[in-house]
């Protein structure tokens, strides 16, 4: 089996990882103290209340950065495919990474004439299962998200802002408890008898973004998903580099 030059695919993957770090830095900036109002007070009864308000506006910039990361992840797969078919006599400019919506369709794509895959390589790619419900479902989702991002910004409406704190209330202890609201909203985090209440760590801001696209499972957090997809691509590159 020929050796494959996958350096271009690796460069695209590294560029995608830089964009993923950009996403994480942008999210970290959204935990700036000036974007949160946290109040700790007693109400009319002998209770202590912790309320918070978030001052975030809608942020399409985040969706644009996420789209950049997804675009480079997707491109790295096409570059990978080009590196595989070139020594087999194929034309890298005329092939794309195989995807399908089910197992039958995926196996058909793997065996498509333009790829010129040898039987051994067919076995390798069959195991990738880049289809909905397959082992490579993250790669399948990246492909679907990339197709969406080519026409509009990805929807990450689920911007959640919150606070995290630890406290004792009577004989009960609560550690690193998070309370979330939709970004730009306000909410009540804690209400407890004041006489028996003590913070062990004071409230600190948090921020989280999740996909709101039908091709990604509900409540999928953006950062971890992108890292996982990048790791899947890296593992695939490693396996082909060892062939």
Residues of each region from the PLM?
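Acidic, Ser/Thr/Gly/Pro-rich intrinsically disordered interaction regions
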Residues: 1-243
């Amino acid at each position: 089996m020929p050796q494959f030059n996958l350096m271009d695919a690796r460069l695209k993957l590294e560029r995608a990882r830089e964009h993923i770090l950009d996403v994480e830095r942008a999210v970290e900036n959204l935990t700036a103290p000036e974007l949160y109002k946290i109040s700790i007070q007693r109400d009319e009864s002998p209770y202590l209340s912790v309320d918070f308000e978030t001052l975030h506006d809608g942020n399409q910039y985040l969706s644009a950065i996420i789209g950049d990361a997804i675009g480079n992840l997707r491109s790295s797969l096409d570059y990978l495919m080009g590196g595989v078919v070139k020594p087999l006599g194929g034309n890298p400019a005329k092939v794309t990474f195989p995807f399908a919506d089910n197992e039958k369709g995926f196996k058909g794509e793997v065996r498509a004439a333009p790829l010129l895959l040898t039987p051994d390589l067919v076995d390798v790619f069959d195991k990738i299962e880049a289809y909905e419900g397959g082992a490579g479902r993250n790669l399948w989702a990246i492909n679907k998200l990339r197709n969406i991002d080519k026409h509009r910004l990805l929807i990450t409406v689920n911007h959640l802002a919150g606070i995290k704190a630890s406290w004792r209330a009577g004989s009960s202890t609560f550690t690193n408890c998070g309370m979330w609201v939709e970004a730009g909203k306000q909410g009540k985090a804690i209400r407890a008898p004041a006489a028996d209440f003590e913070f062990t760590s004071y409230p600190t801001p948090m921020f989280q973004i999740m996909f709101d696209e039908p091709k990604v499972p509900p409540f999928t957090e953006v950062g971890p998903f992108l890292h996982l997809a990048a790791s899947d691509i890296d593992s695939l590159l490693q396996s082909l580099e060892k062939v």
